[in-house]
A protein has these predicted regions:
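N-terminal Rossmann NAD(P)H-binding glycine-rich loop of SDR-like oxidoreductase domains
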Residues: 3-23
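Hydrophobic residues within alpha-helices
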Residues: 12-16, 74, 179
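Conserved glycine-rich Rossmann-like NAD(P)H-binding loop of the short-chain dehydrogenase/reductase
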Residues: 26-32
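Conserved Rossmann-fold NAD(P)-dependent oxidoreductase catalytic core, especially the SDR/UDP-sugar
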Residues: 33, 73-116, 125-129
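NAD(P)H-binding glycine-rich loop region in Rossmannoid oxidoreductase-like domains
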Residues: 34-81, 184-187
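Substrate-positioning beta->alpha
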Residues: 119, 168-180, 191
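Conserved beta-loop-beta element that borders a ligand/cofactor-binding pocket
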Residues: 125-146
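Glycine/proline-rich active-site loop of Rossmann-fold NAD(P)-dependent oxidoreductases
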Residues: 130-131, 145-153, 182-191
Length: 197
């Protein structure tokens, strides 16, 4: 399949690019450094023309736009290009924690991450309002980091996945396996899924 990947150079995006390429997919990377403006639906449409699947793994740190802006632009661009399938590297902060509420709203959630985390939750709301495209919002564990590719992960829904010790963790490499498996299977359309060990 032809996969257009926005954000192929970051920690997560580079792992996704490697995993998809290793599976024989044609991966076309689109990044800010190449001059692409993900907030311009016309540029998005041009970039995703002919794609079987679009994956968005961008970070908006210091970019001057919100993740909800990106969501609206991506969706508009996909519609213009006639592309149907979108997977989004989401955030964990909007996941529900044991006892109720979102991870973002817990007392221990780091203050310096709240702005970006709230943007991720707003973007998820944008995706959830869409019923004409096949999107999947993939929330990682609370802690995602470079590490070992074990091939093991668990999929969940709107609840934060924790292990028997109360930890929520995944390597970027295993998260990329989950993304690639979702690309290959075509499952979990118009849903948010969580991924953790």
């Amino acid at each position: 399949m032809k996969i257009v990947l926005f954000g192929p150079n970051g920690m997560i995006g580079s792992c996704i690019a490697t995993e998809l390429s290793d599976r024989g997919h044609e991966v076309v990377g689109v990044s800010r450094s190449s001059g692409a403006d993900i907030t311009d639906p016309a540029q998005v449409a041009s970039a995703v023309e002919g794609a079987d699947v679009v994956v968005c793994a961008i970070s908006n740190r210091g970019a001057g736009y919100t993740l909800a802006d990106v969501a609206r632009s991506l969706l508009d661009g996909l519609r213009r290009a006639g592309a149907q399938r979108l997977l989004v590297v989401g955030g964990a902060a909007s996941l529900e924690v044991p006892g109720g509420g979102r991870l973002l709203d817990t007392p221990d959630f780091p203050e310096e991450w709240k702005g970006e985390a709230a943007q991720g939750a707003e973007a998820l709301d944008v995706y959830r309002s869409v019923d004409d495209l096949d999107w999947t919002y993939v929330s990682p564990a609370a802690f995602i980091h470079p590490g070992e590719r074990t091939g093991a992960y668990r999929l969940g829904g709107d609840q934060l996945i924790i292990d028997d010790s109360g930890n929520s963790e995944i390597s970027a490499e295993d998260y990329a396996i989950a993304i690639a498996d979702l690309v290959d299977s075509g499952e979990h359309l118009r849903e948010r899924v969580g991924v953790a060990w």
